[in-house]
A protein has these predicted regions:
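A short, glycine-/small-residue-rich helix N-cap motif at loop->alpha-helix starts
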Residues: 26-35, 39, 152-153
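Short beta-strand-to-loop acidic/aromatic patch adjacent to the donor-nucleotide binding site
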Residues: 47-58
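Active-site nucleotide-sugar/metal-binding loop of Leloir-type enzymes
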Residues: 36-49
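Conserved catalytic core of nucleotide-sugar-dependent glycosyltransferases
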Residues: 68-144
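C-terminal catalytic/acceptor-binding lobe
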Residues: 149-219
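N-proximal low-complexity "stem/linker" segments adjacent to membrane-targeting elements
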Residues: 1-24
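Acidic donor-binding/catalytic loop of UDP-sugar-dependent glycosyltransferases
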Residues: 57-71
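Short, high-confidence coil segments that cap the C-terminus of an alpha-helix
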Residues: 47, 76-78, 168
């Protein structure tokens, strides 16, 4: 299995070797454009899977990645992650129906040194609606997909929806990761991206979006 790893930030990531840094050039000033560039590059390299993750994410059990990906592929998944949602009502899925609709586990680190285990429903699940973009594995069957440009937001929701739209599944892997960043964003920028995301996908899907549902034809 050939897994290529790319990160949109410059610091080397722990847990997986041969990380390729996506620079802010070549028309890729946003995380969405960077992901599209990464998909194009992975396709050119003949990879089986693209591993896309933030530079501040540490994969603590890298030996479990390939077995989980084989299982996910067999189950029909072409996008995978480590934590996500079983249904999407609006893009801000962390703020809705947690812990009922979230699945997976991740160790979240904070700037003051604290750590919190987020594990509402840990373990493997091949029936996700979306998985979080801090760690994504995308199969070559999706390398021709391109996400809409929401600048630095919602690329994870978009690539997951595109997999579901094609009849594939999205899986949560049983892989332990530690995300060192506290995250954060300008709410106004996020809200603008969210509005554009919903305008695009409301024309193509019935909300809430869940695994296995049919998407609309758009002419």
């Amino acid at each position: 299995m050939k897994i290529l790893t790319e990160t949109p930030i410059s610091r080397p990531a722990n847990g997986i070797p041969d990380v390729n840094y996506i620079e802010n050039d070549g028309g890729a000033p946003s995380l969405c454009r960077k992901l599209n560039k990464a998909l194009e590059w992975a396709n050119e390299q003949g990879a089986d899977w693209l591993c896309w993750h933030h530079d501040d994410l540490e994969i603590q059990t890298p030996e479990l990645v390939e077995p989980n990906l084989r299982r996910a592929y067999t189950d029909g998944a072409r996008v995978a992650g480590v934590i996500g949602a079983l249904a999407v009502f609006v893009p801000q899925w962390w703020m809705n129906n947690r812990p009922v609709m979230t699945w997976g586990a991740i160790i979240q680190g904070y700037k003051d040194g604290r750590e919190q285990l987020m594990a509402d429903q840990p373990g493997y699940n091949p029936n996700m609606a979306i998985v979080d973009g801090c760690a994504l594995w995308i199969h070559r069957d999706m390398f021709d997909a391109r996400v809409e440009d929401y600048v630095n937001h919602l690329y994870d929701d978009d690539i997951c929806f595109r997999a579901l739209q094609r009849g594939y599944k999205v899986a949560c892997l049983d892989v332990r990761c530690k995300h060192l960043s506290e995250g954060g964003y300008e709410f106004r920028d996020y809200q603008e991206a969210s509005d554009r995301f919903m305008d695009y996908w409301r024309a193509r899907a019935e909300f809430p979006v869940i695994s296995g549902q049919k998407f609309k034809e758009v002419k």
